[in-house]
Amino acid sequence: MSALIARQAPSAAERLADLAVQALVDEADLSPKPGLVDRRGSGAHSDLHLGLMHASAQSLWPAFAAMADAARSEGRVSQALRETLGQLGRDGEAEMLRVTAGVNTHRGAIWALGLLSAAAMLESGASAGGIAASAAALARLDDPAAPHNPDSHGARVCRRYGVLGAREQAQHGFPAVIEHGLPQLLASRRAGAGEQNARLDALLAIMSSLTDTCVLHRAGLEGLTRMQAGARAVLEAGGCASLAGRRRLRALEGEMLSLRASPGGAADLLAATLFLDRLTPAASAPIGSY
């Protein structure tokens, strides 16, 4: 008798959770990232390290699976689904904070990847843009139970500078991902940059266009302007696969460290980019089915 035991195939919700967690791990591992935690060190952070980022990502698997499964059960964008996703996201955040001893590692990623996981379940076979549009429809619905914290870093920055934050990025269909990160990832691959360089280029494309509230909080408008200009300079020099681009990347890293600023918003959206990029080829069956 065979010692092998047949294992039940993972559900669509479990596959989506796998993809979401893997996207977070891949983002954390990507190196060298200016100002961000990576395999070399903690970047501009004093309270984060790579092992903590990995543990945080793994802790979010149940929340992502539950959000995708809730979308499967509801079957459409609705107020009820929005409120369920909100509660599941808060539960996931509580578990993340338990695992990290109170350090906010992935709050923004829970928002972005939670919405996209649910939207991917609703939009079987859809393009990245179609999934992002469904996520936007969910994000535009109000969640009455969501805590209102006008003194959060993000809320204060948005008021002070009149910029859009993570909520509005989702409500507009993740333009930093759909219009910048994903096209750059695909273009750099086609140019033969290699996978790690293509992912770095995607991050830089997001950084060059995003009003990253994490950077605004730490370094103000001057810091944001320097980050965006530095990211554009890398891409204009040929990207991370070129010697000139790598020199520009080192210069940008020096600037981010001197500013003590980390583009955490861009990192979350790179994870969203990697999630959408891998969604179709990684699925062994149509998303939304068992």
UniProtKB/Swiss-Prot annotation:
Catalysed reactions listed for this entry: 3'-dephospho-CoA + ATP = 2'-(5''-triphospho-alpha-D-ribosyl)-3'-dephospho-CoA + adenine
Listed GO MF terms: ATP binding; triphosphoribosyl-dephospho-CoA synthase activity
Keywords: ATP-binding, Nucleotide-binding, Transferase
EC number: 2.4.2.52
InterPro entries from the UniProt entry: CitG (IPR002736), TriPribosyl-deP-CoA_syn (IPR017555)
Family membership noted in the UniProt record: Belongs to the CitG/MdcB family.
Function of the protein: Involved in the formation of 2-(5''-phosphoribosyl)-3'-dephosphocoenzyme-A, the prosthetic group of the acyl-carrier protein of the malonate decarboxylase.
Database matches in PANTHER family: 2-(5''-TRIPHOSPHORIBOSYL)-3'-DEPHOSPHOCOENZYME-A SYNTHASE, TRIPHOSPHORIBOSYL-DEPHOSPHO-COA SYNTHASE
Name of the protein in its database record: Probable 2-(5''-triphosphoribosyl)-3'-dephosphocoenzyme-A synthase
Source organism per UniProt: Stutzerimonas stutzeri (strain A1501)
